[in-house]
Amino acid sequence: MSSSALQVAKTATYLPDLVEVQRASFKWFLEKGLIEELQNFSPISDYTGKLELHFIGEEYRLKRPRHDVEEAKRRDATFASQMYVTCRLINKETGEIKEQEVFIGELPLMTERGTFIINGAERVIVNQIVRSPGVYFKDELDKNGRRTYNASVIPNRGAWLKFETDKNNLLYVRVDKTRKINAHVLMRAMGLSDNDVVDKLRHPEFYQSSIESANDEGINSEDQALLELYKKLRPGEPPSVSGGQQLLHSRFFDPKRYDLGRVGRYKINKKLRLTVPDNVRTLTHEDVLSTIDYLINLELDIGGASLDDIDHLGNRRVRSVGELLQNQVRVGLNRLERIIKERMTVGETDSLTPAQLVNPKPLVAAIKEFFGSSQLSQFMDQTNPLAELTHKRRISALGPGGLTRERAGFAVRDIHPSHYGRLCPIETPEGPNAGLINSLATHARVNEYGFIETPFWEVKNGKVDKEGNPVYLSADLEDECRVAPGDVATDKDGNIIANLIPVRYRQDFEKVPPHQVDYVQLSPVQVISVATSLIPFLEHDDANRALMGSNMQRQAVPLLRPERPLVGTGLESQVARDSGMVPITKVNGTVSYVDANEIVVKDEDGNEHFHYLQKYQRSNQDTCLNQRPIVKIGDRVISGQVLADGSACEGGEIALGQNVLIAYMPWEGYNYEDAILVSERMVTDDLYTSVHIEKYEIEARQTKLGPEEITREIPNISEESLNNLDEMGIIRIGAFVESGDILVGKVTPKGESDQPPEEKLLRAIFGEKARDVRDNSLRVPKTEKGRVLDVRIYTREQGDELPPGANMVVRVYVAQRRKIQVGDKMAGRHGNKGIISRILPREDMPYLPDGTPVDIVLNPLGVPSRMNVGQVFELLMGWAAANLNCRVKVVPFDEMYGAEKSHQTVQAFLEEASKQPGKAWVYNPDDPGKLLLKDGRTGEPFDQPVAVGYSHFLKLVHLVDDKIHARSTGPYSLVTQQPLGGKAQQGGQRLGEMEVWALEAYGAAYTLQELLTVKSDDMQGRNEALNAIVKGKPIPRPGTPESFKVLMRELQSLGLDIGVYTDEGKEVDLMQDINPRRNTPSRPTYESLGTSEYEED
């Protein structure tokens, strides 16, 4: 197929760098965030005030990381740099100053791709969306149905302050959800006189009742107010004026305890129209008075005062890596501060040095904890390049300081008008996290305050000005403008054609003439996320199916020979580039050398630039990362050009699946309920074959009886089984292995007690000591096979860090080729997913008029009820493109080029294709898009014409090989003695409540009895049954299930006198069957206790 790509519609602009969110945030942390924290942290003085320790934050430096990225991955190390900062210790008494550079901990560094390497695993820090600090006004209905208003001042850290009104028009204040306090008591405690307050209010008459109420309570002075405040906030402690002052100061006016943050100060100034300087981060009197004034205006329903919508994106901000890390550094430094103060007090003042005072451990621990176990630090989804890119652009409302799944209501999860162009309305998980985890829209960026902005073209007198740079607006600013959508039709000069344009204004829709339009959206794609923007004809799909399509593209397995989609959207190349999976040249020049492992580019000055390619690396999801050169020696390359394809890339574009010939028709019931019928060609031609790399690991540990040994000499193993092992007992690279084969031979010393009786007998007779070790080798698990790709040996002598108690670690990487098979899951890009039900020989598949058999047969009933008609457009456009020998790019939302444009374009392409020589049969004007197929088995034509075409189909990561599982015998749960569940534990199938009903309904009493006893948790019964089967005797009657005994014990532990009795009323001892020699009952009965204790004198 030729690589010429026809662009049906032109996208307005290129997308911005898609991983900028991560990189820019980390850069800010290194340049500003870290310095800010170190500066806020110093000086630290001891309790006497004699010594002072200053951190000179701007002079911190990072050392070169010990390992580079690849080395860190290989050694299971962290890609991190050591932080040093200059400290100054000042002795106030002697004036002596000691300056020293001190090590304060290790900081993991971000790789170029926006990820972190922690303990050898690639991780991503997900962006968090939280409520912005600031002041919020809300209304509530009290129990009498009267509307009351309240105002909350929410800081970045510190106590919340909430003002509220009651039915008597009194103003109250709560600090951190404590008891209500009269608002005027707080004013007086802050040192404000009645006049100070009244002068600042526009409607003081409303506030008068609060002043009178405070006077009635006898709180007339600042001291009394402070005492009252202390009583309310610290009930039970003896109040004092100084205590009240101290409390008030520490709660609201101490920068270490209370911080509005830059954002909080900006939001409060904006809402209350104040001019407090940016660097004042604590509460001011002005803030409090203006809040009260605004609240009174709301109560009196005076214009200009408005309520806040907490789900509006103007009131929610994004915390990216840099800020999350900054918060964590603050936690670490606070822990460090306590240690420094203690050491200052304990140590000898004269001989102390900064290095002795500063212990890096608390800071290291805090950073480690964040990267290792925070909810926002996630193991990177590396299934394919798109999954990686989407993961870095994910925005989560969960995590520390955010919401929890259980508490989040519908309002938070819902799509809000302010999401337009900022968060994708389509891409979100299905299930409990729906709406809490979102994806950043394609053109969106995060501004310095953490609010999401999106770009627009300015419109001047009805003409779209595309000459200058686009204007980025946050949600707050956009509300004040009239914004037209991106698919507005314009003439070639940029003048808007229509007389009335639909615009969004203050979260509503209205129609206005062109000269009233302020801005036009940059591109139709800017509303949706990256994954969604790869769906062609998206506008013809129902949102639920588009959501599934977006999510399933992230689960596509990279194939052996990827193929770009015939019908794309034009964003494929940018996704591949920004994912970091394809190497890109940074200079103009000529390719001077190419092989499978490296590409060398010589620039115009004759300098050589080396690009090393990844070969068959294992990804986090066990898929294969591999890069293939696409340039030849002598090629001219320009800066930014792609040099090699990564996994799931072809020609520098993302290629998640294959273009296959699809027919929509039922076939013998094999595509009932979304099942998929596929041709054998998919297997034989390796269309959907993927490479998976499994990692197996074994440790040789130090045991009580001596060290474990990795060796070739394994007891009771045939020489044949050791064929592929080297002299150390480790498998050779390139060997083919099946399940059960030994990968690494290991023997463990065993103690006297471990020996079976026959060995003891041999010893007693011959006095010879059989080698007392047992086989503990690493073997290939059940259902797995493949070829050994790599072996890595880690020992302490080589300088590797090993887990405690281990002397040696061996890792074996086994690659396997997985062809497509029955039970694998496949999907298109429109949420049309299914499981393969049968693989049919290609001669039996329905075939086209020219004799070509189709590759896949899908059920036509999968389209109408699901309303994802985009798949039909893609099918026919793909059919036309394949026959025209070209590829097509279709931008979503194409009605700006005319009504019903998708329809017309597809039809025009089909007509064009049928004009090619010998292709007249491709398009039938009487039945457009359908062809008469013949049955491969009989050669007879089918009754009706069938929709046929080329579609891009993906193989998803839910492979049957990873899920299929069977158990004959295996491990049991200790308490209930029932088989464990799940493949990993070699578990059994659960026979649940409903399955029991089914057997009861059929009256299959004996089957049911043995399922609930012998086959499950009747311990004695199952042993007896096994013996009976081995000896060929009839199976004895089942006994009591263990779980019933557990239930009895639990009821007895609650103090219930409960037992099991026969018809005659004799108690049955349930524990009898475990130890037949035990005569005492399982719980004390009057008979067993004897009556001697209870006999009367």
From Swiss-Prot:
One GO cellular component, as annotated: DNA-directed RNA polymerase complex
One of the record's GO molecular function terms: DNA binding
GO annotation (BP), single: DNA-templated transcription
SUPFAM superfamilies found in the cross-reference section: beta and beta-prime subunits of DNA dependent RNA-polymerase (SSF64484)
Catalytic reaction list: RNA(n) + a ribonucleoside 5'-triphosphate = RNA(n+1) + diphosphate
EC class (word): transferase
EC number of this enzyme: 2.7.7.6
Regions of compositional bias (Polar residues) in chain numbering: 1077-1091
Highest taxon of source: Bacteria
Alphabetized UniProt keyword annotations: DNA-directed RNA polymerase, Nucleotidyltransferase, Transcription, Transferase
Stretches for region Disordered: 1072-1097
UniProt similarity note: Belongs to the RNA polymerase beta chain family.
Subunit-level organization: In cyanobacteria the RNAP catalytic core is composed of 2 alpha, 1 beta, 1 beta', 1 gamma and 1 omega subunit. When a sigma factor is associated with the core the holoenzyme is formed, which can initiate transcription.
NCBIfam families the UniProt entry points to: PRK00405.1, rpoB
HAMAP family assigned to the protein according to its UniProt record, in alphabetical order: RNApol_bact_RpoB (MF_01321)
Function comment: DNA-dependent RNA polymerase catalyzes the transcription of DNA into RNA using the four ribonucleoside triphosphates as substrates.
Name the record gives this protein: DNA-directed RNA polymerase subunit beta
Protein source organism: Prochlorococcus marinus (strain MIT 9301)
Upper taxonomic lineage: Bacteria, Bacillati, Cyanobacteriota, Cyanophyceae, Synechococcales
Gene name of the record: rpoB
